[in-house]
Amino acid sequence: MTERSNNRQSQIYNFIKSQIKQKGYPPSVREICTAVGLKSTSTVHSYLEKLERRGFIKRDATKSRTIEVIEKSQKKEMIEVPIIGTITAGMPIIAVENIEDYFPLPMDYIKNKREIFMLRVKGESMVDAGILDGDLSLIEKVHSAENGDIVVALIENEATLKRFFKEENHIRLQPENKNMPPIIVDDCKIIGRLIGIYRQYE
């Protein structure tokens, strides 16, 4: 998330808070547009969605002027999880380790995990495990795995999400799709283990 994006979110949040304090009710989306210098109501809606996901506001999508500011005492402690590039759940692609954005999650969800990140799934090789194209996979950074773990593995600088099996003289990276064959390699680098999936419904 860019600094400019964060600043705009702060402007919108502060304006909503001040309007509720002054008038007793929240501003409309068009009033927010005018106050922060945005022309598009859809852009404001996207900022409101981010503020809601981060736990700063609450809305009722079926009604207008229903934005509610959530005070700090009501909020759960959140962590910003980096979304790093895109990996494949089909044919491997070049791993891109650049942070595209951040995704807020309650600290309760993370528990005692040391280092986590998210990667976007591409392809259908893990559908039988309930992992679909476009899902955000929540990954704990680890360098080893137990048989049966779903891992992010690097093979010659290409990343893939598969189920891990260390066998007699090779490693089997098994898709969860009966129509796709396993990847058999002598060795691979484990960069993470799947601990969760986030899916957004339209």
UniProtKB/Swiss-Prot annotation:
Q: Where is the active site?
A: S125, K162
DNA-binding region residues: the ranges are 29-49
Select a single GO molecular function from the record's annotations and give it.
DNA binding
Q: Which reaction does it catalyse?
A: Hydrolysis of Ala-|-Gly bond in repressor LexA
Q: Where are the transmembrane segments?
A: none
Gene3D superfamilies for the chain: Umud Fragment, subunit A, Winged helix-like DNA-binding domain superfamily/Winged helix DNA-binding domain
**Keyword set for this entry?**
Autocatalytic cleavage, DNA damage, DNA repair, DNA replication, DNA-binding, Hydrolase, Repressor, SOS response, Transcription, Transcription regulation
User: Which residues does the UniProt site feature Cleavage point to?
Assistant: A89, G90
User: What processes does the entry annotate via GO biological process terms?
Assistant: DNA repair; DNA replication; negative regulation of DNA-templated transcription; proteolysis; SOS response
Q: Does the keyword Zinc apply?
A: no
Any idea of its EC number? 3.4.21.88
Please state which protein family the record places this protein in: Belongs to the peptidase S24 family.
Q: What does this protein do?
A: Represses a number of genes involved in the response to DNA damage (SOS response), including recA and lexA. In the presence of single-stranded DNA, RecA interacts with LexA causing an autocatalytic cleavage which disrupts the DNA-binding part of LexA, leading to derepression of the SOS regulon and eventually DNA repair.
NCBIfam families xref list: lexA (TIGR00498)
Q: How does it assemble?
A: Homodimer.
Name of protein: LexA repressor
Upper lineage ranks? Bacteria, Bacillati, Bacillota, Clostridia, Eubacteriales
